[in-house]
Amino acid sequence: DSAKAFEKEGAQVNLVPFVTIDEEAIVKSVDKMVDNIVNSDIIFFAGGFSAADEPDGSAKFIVNILLNEKVRAAIDSFIERGGLIIGICNGFQALVKSGLLPYGNFEDASSTSPTLFYNDANQHVARMVETRIVNTNSPWLAGVTVGDIHAIPVSHGEGKFVVTAEEFARLRDNGQIWSQYVDFDGQPSMDS
């Protein structure tokens, strides 16, 4: 679905699976990933399942790939030249766990690092929710306006973004929060 959406908007998409069947396949996958990063303007990390979808299972796997010396160097160069990175589902979770979000570079996780945690319902949630755009300080938000409300699908078990009050204030003040959940009357809500 994501590849089709990018293609619909005129992007040339290269799907790059990471093969782990043996050590040789992993080495080839790293090299192919690096070659694609070097020749890309956008990197998109999709979601997926691994390890019986244990808590952040695929995200931990993706982070290990991102921390590979060659991949990390390629991503650092990619960021320096202004490349765009986005992730959904476990791909987003991996960006948070690696520090690429919200810091824009690799950061070691600490006890106060932002993270994704179990929903308040403590179970998988799949439904439509409403969000309001509160900031358009990103190329990803071209064509939307502050105040726009969008109905979007969510499907997650670990969809709660947890951050300290100080970090929240920093993200807000830096213009890094671009939407908030709202109820059907457009009022801010913690119900995701």
Question: Which ranges hold each PLM region?
Answer:
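Intrinsic disorder/low-complexity segments enriched in polar/small residues
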Residues: 108-109, 131
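C-terminal and late-domain segments of enzyme folds
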Residues: 4-7, 128, 133-192
